């Protein structure tokens, strides 16, 4: 007890002395003493850890507080309490922690004294933060924006409170690994990426060939972001027989006891360590001690590990081992010191299977409504972050600071939602409900903030405007369900101004669809007067459509007025009212107005699309600009989820997609009702089978793509059979089994059906084994005809190309059996989804990325309509309020290809802003022209912000790029990229803040303003 108190006192005195000297020591700058490693013995790095899911079987709160123990015996607060106590009892012990969402809660509950003690443990290296994100994010269903944001949230906390920046990526539980995740970890400056899961065939080959560690160069565009990767030998839990917290025999080393077992237990552990060593190339092995929510009673672990280490190390000749408490960073340093040459991997780690019948490809689609809601809130968070920065000069600093504090709610809930059992859809139902509720709370908080900011912007700039009453802003979150209470005042003659916000970095000329209660309206633009509009009358509802021109990071206003209102301007243009025309009734009866064989044609200046007059199905698509044509069909099919059979008991469930057979059934054999709308703004074909299956093909007058809106679900299980629903597109393209999918919305990955670049694949599951995640983009190409067919999605899905010229997109799934991977519930979700895709068909030589990249960003960052009301004419309203706003210097201040990815306050008291700018195009070698490096002067972007300094940082904004130092590794190809090889390291540009951006590069800056 005396030693323990003295140990604590020394820590506290050390911190007090630092404070007195006025120093804020950054722990990354402190050279910790290296552990004693052996050059002749096998060094066994024991890594004490807990894997704390930020929700899974229990909610985040239940896991933290330890409630609902009947579901899972876990309480993170007790884990941290007991682990810290055990570290203080023995300075040799170490512990790593990963999930900052939990640690931040625990930290905030601690006294100042305890916080200082913990800082001392971090200083000494006993407690080390690994990975350091708000959660351990999924890699298949997360968007790259969200991944970077949640890592930033965790790293900012660690830097502000401890002065540390993690150096190792630790993703030991996600169910497959993406190229983008590896690239992000490289750009963060991580020295290594440690993973726990790898396909069973891949890992068998690697174990045999000692290739469990390699250099992962996952991107052609930014190869300097390669990262050394190490695969754990046997997942991330304690070796069998040594889980002292869960009932395995303790180490009994008292020679006076009859049941002394220290020799046999040491021999047992030695065999484990030596087996591990046969698969790795250095005399170092990492053996994790811990598992899910481990160290709830940390003393049970540490006391026994102490004995194991002491006994084995006292007998080096007998056991041949050097055991030590270690961390992943210590282990990686030791591997690096071996100075070996490493193989290079360039493909990703999808799909993942843990045996021949179990491909983890179902979760790419599980809970698609939640996946869509997460994506929607990502877009909203970026809107509110942008607004808070660009409007802060218009409001009192105290008000601006409060609004920035308010948005932390949304940042944190979005950080939680990226967890690998959250957006992935692999949680229990009550946990999914909890995530949705948290997102809803964050959503409401964000909309309240936007209401305040937009009110400020509307009344800014000019005395007359500033004297106007601040309007109240409302929103219509159910626009995709044709519900918008904000437009109800039109029925009583009140006009409805609609402010439409664009969060992208270029002017957008896009269609807007708004449900309205009446048909006879006009639309007036704040900048262009009365404009053409269209009202579609469908099943008794009215949908207003018009083309809106919106400046970057800003809004434009369009005022909707009833033609019967007293506020109609004399020269206003009434909306064109269009009644949908029934072409085919539900029973398949053909309307006499249409010849049986004549196709239905939707056409604009860019594309021509033909549909069957029998059932409204798509027949062909022609790109009128390049003159290329392909026949194309689309059908809904479903796979019968396995409930186990003689080959394997494996069921299809939350994680696993395992169909009973590779044959897929037509989802609905009935002929749908088909209706058509033709208008100046849009024309569409609507196919209605039932309220559970509706498909609309929509062609806008200014679009080079075809939009597809689909309503699917709840999935019918009245026959007692679950269903996994796929939308299959079949073209005449000859694709040679090759197709492409994005990686978390970023770089495209080449896929070849029934093939893996890294090993010789034995095909056992030809359907589920070929599905990979798609977050935004999938396409097929016919090089001989120079044709490309692209599908752009609004949320993550699973995709495959099982036949030449085909793309299969899994849309929704509902299974009736648990798949045995821990969640303990079937994927029996009864939700309906409303989802939007874009179909793009073009000549490869027409620089394909310029078509699909902006289209994908448009879906991921949709325009945001904001509504208010007025009892004024549009002219009077425009004279009082700022109807058009952009904080940028022009309609296109950024060169084509550059995008402001992040614009958010770091500290608005110090006027410091986190700014990320990305080049959205990649080097892929497929286009006739690859993107070039783009130059930008940061000082020319903003009109409302004057940049006084710009310091380039690592990706999460906590470490100067000029100070970033990574371990050097040798590779078999000799390409040992410098992390800064394509990046300027100048902190403050003396030439107008000029920087260059190579293809697919994201550069991060902390800028200060006046």
From Swiss-Prot:
Residues with site note (Cleavage): 507-508, 589-590, 593-594
Cofactor(s) recorded in Swiss-Prot or TrEMBL: Zn(2+)
InterPro entries tied to this protein: Gal_mutarotase_sf_dom, GH38_C, Glyco_hydro/deAcase_b/a-brl, Glyco_hydro_38_C, Glyco_hydro_38_cen, Glyco_hydro_38_cen_sf, Glyco_hydro_38_N, Glyco_hydro_38_N_sf
Keywords: Disulfide bond, Glycoprotein, Glycosidase, Hydrolase, Lysosome, Metal-binding, Signal, Zinc, Zymogen
Pfam families given in the database record: Alpha-mann_mid (PF09261), Glyco_hydro38C2 (PF17677), Glyco_hydro_38C (PF07748), Glyco_hydro_38N (PF01074)
Glycan-linked positions: 68, 480, 520, 528, 539, 623, 760, 784, 828, 954, 963
Chain residues in the propeptide: 23-40, 508-595
EC number, as in UniProt: 3.2.1.24
Binding residues for Zn(2+): 51, 53, 173, 420
Active site (record annotation): 173
Post-translational modifications reported in the UniProt record: First cleaved into the mature 58 kDa subunit and an intermediate 82 kDa subunit. The latter is then cleaved to its mature 60 kDa subunit form. These events occur in multiple intracellular compartments. The 60 kDa subunit may form one or more intramolecular disulfide bonds.
Protein family membership: Belongs to the glycosyl hydrolase 38 family.
Subunit structure: Tetramer of equimolar amounts of 60 and 58 kDa subunits.
Protein name, per record: Lysosomal alpha-mannosidase
Organism: Dictyostelium discoideum (Social amoeba)
């Amino acid at each position: 007890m005396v030693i323990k108190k003295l140990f604590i006192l020394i820590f506290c005195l050390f911190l007090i002395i630092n404070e007195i000297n006025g120093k804020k020591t950054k722990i990354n700058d402190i050279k910790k003493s290296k552990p004693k490693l052996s050059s002749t013995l096998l060094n066994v790095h024991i890594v004490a850890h807990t894997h704390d899911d930020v929700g899974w079987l229990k909610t985040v709160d239940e896991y933290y507080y330890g409630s609902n123990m009947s579901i899972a015996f876990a309480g993170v607060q007790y884990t941290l309490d007991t682990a810290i106590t055990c570290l203080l009892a023995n300075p040799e012990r170490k512990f790593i922690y990963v999930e900052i969402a939990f640690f931040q809660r625990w930290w905030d509950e601690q006294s100042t004294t305890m916080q200082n003690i913990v800082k001392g443990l971090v200083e000494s290296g006993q407690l080390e933060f690994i990975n350091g994100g708000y959660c351990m994010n999924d890699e298949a269903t997360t968007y790259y924006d969200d991944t970077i944001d949640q890592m930033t949230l965790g790293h900012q906390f660690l830097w502000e409170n401890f002065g540390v920046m993690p150096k190792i990526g630790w993703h030991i539980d996600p169910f497959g690994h993406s190229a983008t995740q590896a690239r992000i970890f490289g750009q963060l400056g991580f020295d290594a990426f440690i993973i726990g899961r790898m396909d069973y065939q891949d890992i068998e080959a690697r174990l045999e060939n000692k290739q469990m560690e390699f250099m992962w160069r996952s991107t052609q565009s930014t190869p300097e972001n390669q990262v050394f990767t190490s695969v754990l030998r046997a997942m991330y839990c304690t070796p069998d027989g040594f889980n002292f917290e869960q009932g395995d025999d303790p180490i009994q080393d008292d020679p006076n006891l009859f049941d002394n077992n220290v020799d046999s237990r040491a021999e047992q552990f030695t065999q484990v360590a030596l087996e591990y060593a046969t698969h790795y190339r250095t005399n170092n092995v990492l053996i994790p001690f811990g598992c899910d929510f481990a160290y709830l009673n940390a003393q049970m672990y540490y006391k026994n590990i102490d004995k194991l280490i002491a006994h084995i190390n006292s007998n080096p000749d007998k056991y041949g081992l050097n055991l030590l408490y270690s961390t992943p960073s210590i282990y990686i340093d030791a591997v690096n010191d071996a100075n070996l040459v490493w193989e290079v991997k360039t493909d990703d780690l999808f799909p993942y299977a843990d045996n021949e019948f179990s491909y983890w490809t179902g979760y790419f689609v599980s809970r698609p409504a939640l996946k869509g809601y997460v994506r929607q809130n990502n877009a909203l968070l970026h809107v509110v972050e942008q607004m808070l920065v660009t409007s802060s000069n218009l409001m009192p600093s105290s008000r601006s600071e409060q609004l920035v504090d308010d948005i932390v709610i949304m940042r944190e809930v979005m950080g939680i939602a990226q967890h690998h059992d959250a957006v992935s859809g692999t949680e229990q139902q009550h946990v999914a409900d909890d995530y949705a509720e948290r997102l809803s709370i964050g959503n409401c908080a964000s909309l309240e903030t936007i209401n305040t900011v937009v009110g400020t912007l509307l009344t800014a700039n000019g005395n007359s405007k500033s004297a106007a009453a601040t309007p109240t802003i409302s929103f219509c979150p159910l626009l995709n369900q044709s519900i918008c209470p904000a437009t109800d005042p039109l029925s009583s003659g009140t006009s409805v101004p609609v402010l439409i916000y664009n969060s992208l970095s270029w002017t957008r000329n896009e269609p807007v669809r708004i449900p309205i209660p009446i048909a006879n309206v006009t639309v007036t633009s704040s900048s262009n007067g009365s404009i053409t509009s269209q009202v579609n009358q469908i099943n008794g509802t009215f949908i207003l459509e018009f083309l809106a021109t919106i400046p970057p990071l800003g809004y434009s206003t369009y005022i909707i007025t009833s033609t019967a209102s007293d506020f109609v301007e004399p020269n206003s243009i009434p909306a064109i009212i269009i009644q949908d025309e029934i072409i085919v009734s539900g029973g398949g009866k053909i309307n006499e107005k249409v010849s049986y064989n004549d196709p239905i044609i939707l056409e604009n200046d860019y594309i021509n699309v033909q549909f069957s007059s029998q059932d409204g199905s798509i027949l062909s698509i022609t790109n009128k600009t390049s003159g290329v044509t392909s026949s194309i069909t689309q059908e809904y099919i479903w796979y019968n989820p396995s409930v186990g059979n003689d080959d394997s008991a494996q069921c299809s469930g939350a994680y696993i997609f395992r169909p009973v057979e590779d044959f897929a059934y037509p989802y609905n054999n009935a002929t749908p009702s088909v209706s058509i709308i033709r208008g100046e703004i849009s024309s569409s074909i609507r196919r209605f089978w039932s309220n559970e299956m509706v498909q609309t093909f929509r062609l806008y007058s200014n679009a080079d793509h075809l939009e597809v809106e689909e309503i699917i679900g709840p999935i019918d299980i009245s026959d007692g059979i679950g269903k996994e629903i796929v939308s299959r597109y079949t073209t005449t393209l000859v694709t040679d089994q090759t197709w492409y999918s994005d990686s978390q919305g970023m770089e495209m990955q080449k896929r070849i059906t029934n093939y893996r670049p890294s090993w010789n694949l034995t095909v056992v599951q030809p359907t589920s084994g070929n599905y990979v995640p798609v977050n935004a983009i999938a396409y097929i190409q016919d090089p001989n005809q120079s044709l490309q067919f692209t599908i752009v999605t609004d949320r993550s899905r699973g995709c495959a190309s099982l036949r030449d010229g085909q793309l299969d997109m899994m849309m929704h799934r509902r299974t009736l059996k648990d798949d045995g991977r821990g969640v303990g519930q079937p994927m029996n979700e009864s939700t309906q989804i409303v989802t939007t895709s874009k179909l793009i068909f073009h000549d490869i030589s027409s620089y394909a990325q310029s078509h699909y990249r902006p289209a994908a960003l448009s879906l991921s960052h949709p325009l945001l309509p904001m509504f208010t009301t007025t009892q004024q004419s549009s002219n009077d309203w425009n004279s009082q309020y700022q109807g058009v706003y952009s904080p940028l210097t022009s309609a296109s201040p950024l060169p084509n290809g550059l995008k402001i990815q992040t614009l958010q306050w770091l500290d608005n008291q110090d006027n410091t802003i986190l700014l990320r700018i990305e080049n959205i195009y990649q080097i892929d070698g497929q286009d006739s022209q690859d993107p070039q490096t783009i130059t930008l002067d940061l000082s020319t972007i903003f009109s409302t912000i004057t940049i006084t300094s710009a310091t380039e940082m690592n990706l999460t904004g906590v470490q100067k790029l000029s100070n970033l130092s990574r371990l050097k590794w040798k590779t078999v190809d000799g390409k040992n990229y410098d992390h800064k090889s394509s990046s300027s390291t100048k902190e403050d540009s003396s030439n107008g803040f000029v920087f260059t951006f190579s293809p697919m590069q994201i550069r991060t800056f902390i800028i200060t303003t006046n």
